[in-house]
């Protein structure tokens, strides 16, 4: 899962930086952007 988290982490930040915050953990866990 390390590879998935590493790949997903930058993707989420680039996808929607203003939406990422306290929910980042949830977003990474679900693998979806919950904006």
Swiss-Prot record:
- Propiece residues: 1-10, 19-35
Q: Does the keyword Hydrolase apply?
A: no
Q: Name one GO molecular function term.
A: toxin activity
Record carries keyword Transcription: no
Tissue and organ distribution: Expressed in basidiocarps.
Quote the PTM field: Processed by the macrocyclase-peptidase enzyme POPB to yield a toxic cyclic octapeptide. POPB first removes 10 residues from the N-terminus. Conformational trapping of the remaining peptide forces the enzyme to release this intermediate rather than proceed to macrocyclization. The enzyme rebinds the remaining peptide in a different conformation and catalyzes macrocyclization of the N-terminal 8 residues.
Give the intrachain disulfide bonds. Answer: none
Name under which the protein is recorded = MSDIN-like toxin proprotein 6
What is the species of this protein? Amanita exitialis (Guangzhou destroying angel)
What phylogenetic lineage does the species belong to? Eukaryota, Fungi, Dikarya, Basidiomycota, Agaricomycotina
């Amino acid at each position: 899962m390390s590879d998935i988290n590493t790949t997903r982490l930058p993707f989420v930040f680039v996808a929607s930086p203003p939406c990422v915050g306290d929910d980042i953990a949830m977003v990474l866990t679900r693998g979806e952007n919950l904006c």
